[in-house]
Amino acid sequence: MERQKSMEKGLLRKSLSIRERKFPNEDAFLESGLSRKSPREVKKPQNDDGECRVTASVFLSTFVAVSGSFCTGCGVGFSSGAQAGITKDLSLSVAEYSMFGSILTLGGLIGAVFSGKVADVLGRKRTMLFCEFFCITGWLCVALAQNAMWLDCGRLLLGIGVGIFSYVIPVYIAEIAPKHVRGSFVFANQLMQNCGISLFFIIGNFIPWRLLTVVGLVPCVFHVFCLFFIPESPRWLAKLGRDKECRSSLQRLRGSDVDISREANTIRDTIDMTENGGETKMSELFQRRYAYPLIIGVGLMFLQQLCGSSGVTYYASSLFNKGGFPSAIGTSVIATIMVPKAMLATVLVDKMGRRTLLMASCSAMGLSALLLSVSYGFQSFGILPELTPIFTCIGVLGHIVSFAMGMGGLPWIIMAEIFPMNVKVSAGTLVTVTNWLFGWIITYTFNFMLEWNASGMFLIFSMVSASSIVFIYFLVPETKGRSLEEIQALLNNSVQ
């Protein structure tokens, strides 16, 4: 234990001091063991402050990874746009459609249970391919469904793929991106989900639901093809002891003219330190040294879902209809605004920081939920009926857009940043399961609560959003501008 503490403190001092050091060319030659060569023969020394350039390979790899997020968004947006058509064609009751809508999150829960282990065994790339098998099969089942059973089976399979995606995509991006753009690149996960949701919100108003499933298949096939052209995560390769492949992958990501030896050595040192005791089992996760990051990860996912985000997104059409606002117009307006707002958040996440965006997002979600509570409360008592459609539109729009700007993507960024490699499987699985478990509870009960007491439901969501602000302010650290190794060293140091 003393040896491990010493190594952690040493790594912390090394990580923090590197920020202030600038290695001149002479020192770069000495540290890398290179002899003097002509400028054309020498690779550029990479300062280990993470400020390396963002190469085309990093852009391409991130884009391909978040194409899976786009597939996720298509699956999430499908239930809102297809609700009227499916209910009419297959004569589904409210309970049957609630099961169909929510079973995606149940599948996500099943996928989340195995997500960490699958990603650890197969690797990040092959895990994404594995996900697409479930997604493609699921879309085909929904497209050919003649009754509720086939609908539910297809939606469940799609959910399993989406559940594994939700873990492996942010982890993969966090492991390949330089630290000064890591937040923005991981947030692209949420951006592309919003693009998928927006697309289905818009076209779901105009095309039959079976044709909509075919549209959902197209990005899945595209994603499978593109995955063959990106490198594997260097940190996963290093964890398996495949150092040569790790350096090759890192070289491809950082550029062929960059000396990656210092970054590769830092990755190796950190993995050696964190895995000194071997792979951590789920039963061993609940130790004092892991308590702080575990509370952060699980807490954020718990609060994310109890703010009502999944229910509002899945059943936006029902909310508009209940408030007397045209659902086709409402969902189209949401779709138009969601993507630009998420793009803005993608830019701001590495400028404003995680904490600021999270608290701003929760504040806006809380106010939007409060407005919806007032709107449906007025409606139930017959007060100012002419304002109900306006309040409903503003409330639903504000809730979904503010979620997209922060609380939607940032918990996944933080999850990918705070856990060391030796607990990333068990901790990441637990955090992802928490998200999907409470997501399923919210989406399944949402329609029933909406019919029972819509005003009271949104009042609860508003109070949870307020509680989230307190949680973030006191417990969630700022991880902007730090490498994964620095974050892990600082979190370890904070509990000693």
Curated annotation (Swiss-Prot):
InterPro entries: MFS_dom, MFS_ERD6/Tret1-like, MFS_sugar_transport-like, MFS_trans_sf, MFS_Trehalose_Transporter, Sugar/inositol_transpt, Sugar_transporter_CS. It holds the Pfam family Sugar_tr. Gene3D superfamilies: MFS general substrate transporter like domains. GO terms for molecular function: sugar transmembrane transporter activity. Keywords: Membrane, Phosphoprotein, Stress response, Sugar transport, Transmembrane, Transmembrane helix, Transport. This is Sugar transporter ERD6. Belongs to the major facilitator superfamily. Sugar transporter (TC 2.A.1.1) family. Induction: By dehydration and cold treatment. By drought and high salinity conditions, with maximal expression after 1 and 2 hours of exposure to these conditions. Expression in leaves decreases after exposure to the high salinity and abscisic acid (ABA) treatment, but expression in roots remain at a constant level. Expressed in both shoots and roots. In roots, expressed in epidermal cells and especially strongly in cortex cells. In flowers, expressed in sepals. It is found in: Membrane. It comes from Arabidopsis thaliana. It is a multi-pass membrane protein. The modification Phosphoserine is found at residue 256. The gene is ERD6.
